Regions:
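Conserved beta-strand-loop-alpha-helix hinge in the C-terminal portion
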Residues: 161, 165, 173-185
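ABC family nucleotide-binding domain
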Residues: 1-169
Length: 185
């Protein structure tokens, strides 16, 4: 995921995002900071919230950095916080949140810029079954509404069947199987 997200450099090969060339045989051909900010949403296994910003500002910061007006960025943040059932914690600081609440805020942050690609590493790990399925539904809604590709790495057996395409990596070999695709197309 870190290579796909242009967090670490590819050493060989070619990578494109849509029609844009990102890497070509290890050479960076696009400004990676802008690519990560504007085109890729990250949901890490650990929330990595900024400790001195409240919940709303943690989510609204990325669109603000991308040039979205503050009012619109905060509106988007509050919509996602509501969808993820943490709107009541909008003014709380990260240290005041439970682990599950922190993860839902991190998920909102990954979705708020409406990127064409979302990379999610164990996004449901700290969540109970009900909230995990709610997160998967929200990811599916995002994919449909904004034509977003979502790549999820997970060990959560309960959510795996909800995806349309499923790839397992065993002993360094990738195997594909069909999912039921109820939540994500």
């Amino acid at each position: 995921l870190r290579c796909l997200g242009a967090v670490i450099d590819a050493t060989a090969g070619r990578m494109t995002l849509g029609d844009e060339l990102v890497y070509d045989d290890g050479w960076k051909v696009r400004a990676l900071r802008a690519l990560r900010r504007d085109k890729i949403g990250f949901v890490f296994q650990a929330p990595y919230l900024i400790p001195f910003l409240d919940v709303t500002d943690n989510v609204a910061l990325l669109p603000m950095l991308a040039g979205v007006p503050n009012d619109e960025a905060r509106k988007r943040a509050l919509e996602l916080l509501t969808a993820l059932d943490v709107q009541h914690r909008a003014q709380a600081m990260p240290a005041q949140l439970s682990g599950g609440e922190q993860q839902r805020v991190a998920i909102a942050r990954g979705l708020v810029n409406r990127p064409p690609v979302i990379l999610a590493d164990e996004p449901t790990a700290p969540l109970d079954s009900q909230r995990a399925m709610a997160v998967v539904r929200i990811l599916g809604d995002m994919a449909r509404k904004y034509q977003t590709a979502i790549i999820v790495v997970t060990h959560d057996e309960k959510i795996i069947p909800t995806f349309k395409r499923i790839y397992h990596i065993r002993d360094g070999v990738t195997h594909e199987e069909a999912g039921e695709g109820r939540a994500l197309d």
